């Protein structure tokens, strides 16, 4: 079995820069995921983030999750559950404006630490985007500029905990999906596993490595690179023992950012059309919200339909929605 790619960022500025860039390129083309070590975020900050998040879950979120489980009767389920995920979660928005001060039940030290963490992650995300540009032969800053829109990128953090599950064979921690946005930076528990990606038709564990940051690519990177780089289906498997921490930060295009394949990556012949659609990111997100746990290809096709005529677009979206409703009823 292939070995999950691990990239040492210490090597990016030395004699092994070319080899490190090639490793990132291969991971983006063939995995859609890779793991970063020596990424520049201090271990002290990572340890503080982990402790504060685990303490917050125990103090505030754990009992609420147990009450939800009891209310829905999930401990006694006898057949597979397809409509929900075994996770306790909340979302912190950083850009274009922060909502951290508005989230209830967060201690002031927690808010301060997560703001500091977000600053470091934003810098790392933009550094990685420029490395992707270098590999793709795009001008430095191209991806950041493509994401910018009128108010800058959307950047936020999904804080999740996956408690022990009494029926891990029947309930997913998080159902299989690709991420809608740009580049995702995950700080995950190094003691409790559960994240898997779909590689060559088989589910493969993403190894939890202490103090690492897991990177994965979203649908917008696939579109901008015209399919050279891929977003990959992934899921979280519920575990019967231990609570898994997951802190995933999403560096996404701005709502009004216009997303399309980079002209430099299209074939030179003018008669060859792009494989991927052109759209406003917010329009894609509206479609994604109802189709997250389905294959990405129908989403791309629905967005491409909007490039033709309004009538064809309406028909295409109605067909997608009808099929979705039908599947949900089965």
From Swiss-Prot:
Any GO BP annotation: fruit ripening
Superkingdom in the source lineage: Eukaryota
Family: Belongs to the iron/ascorbate-dependent oxidoreductase family.
Descriptive protein name: 1-aminocyclopropane-1-carboxylate oxidase 2
PROSITE patterns given in the database record: FE2OG_OXY
Keyword annotations: Ethylene biosynthesis, Fruit ripening, Iron, Metal-binding, Oxidoreductase, Vitamin C
Entry's EC annotation: 1.14.17.4
Gene responsible for this protein: ACO2
């Amino acid at each position: 079995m292939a070995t999950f790619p691990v990239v040492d960022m210490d090597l990016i500025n030395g004699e092994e820069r070319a080899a490190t860039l090639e490793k990132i390129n291969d991971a983006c083309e063939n995995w859609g995921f890779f793991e970063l070590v020596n990424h520049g975020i201090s271990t002290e900050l990572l340890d503080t983030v982990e402790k504060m998040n685990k303490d917050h879950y125990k103090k505030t979120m754990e009992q609420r999750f147990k009450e939800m489980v009891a209310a829905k009767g999930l401990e006694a389920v006898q057949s597979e559950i397809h409509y929900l995920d075994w996770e306790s979660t909340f979302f912190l928005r950083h850009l274009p404006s922060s909502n951290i001060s508005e989230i209830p039940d967060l201690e002031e030290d927690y808010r301060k630490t997560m703001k500091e963490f977000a600053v470091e992650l934003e810098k790392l995300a933009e550094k990685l985007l420029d490395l992707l540009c270098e590999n793709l032969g795009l001008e430095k800053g191209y991806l950041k500029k493509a994401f910018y829109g009128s108010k800058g990128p959307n950047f936020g953090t999904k804080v999740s905990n996956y408690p022990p599950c009494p029926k891990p064979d029947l309930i997913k921690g998080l159902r299989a999906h690709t991420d809608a946005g740009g580049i995702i930076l995950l700080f995950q528990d190094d003691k409790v596993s559960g994240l898997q990606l779909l590689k060559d038709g088989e589910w493969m564990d993403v190894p939890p490595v202490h103090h690492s940051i897991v990177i994965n690519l979203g649908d917008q990177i696939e579109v901008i690179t015209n399919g050279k780089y891929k977003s990959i289906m992934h899921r979280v498997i519920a575990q019967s023992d231990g609570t898994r921490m997951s802190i995933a930060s999403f560096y996404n295009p701005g709502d009004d950012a216009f997303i399309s394949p980079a002209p430099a990556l299209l074939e030179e012949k003018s008669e060859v059309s792009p494989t991927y659609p052109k759209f406003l990111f917010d329009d894609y997100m509206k479609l994604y919200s109802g189709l997250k746990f389905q294959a990405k290809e129908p989403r791309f096709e629905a967005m491409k339909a909007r490039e033709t005529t309004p009538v064809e677009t309406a028909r295409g979206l109605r067909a997608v929605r009808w099929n979705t409703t039908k599947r949900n009823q089965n």
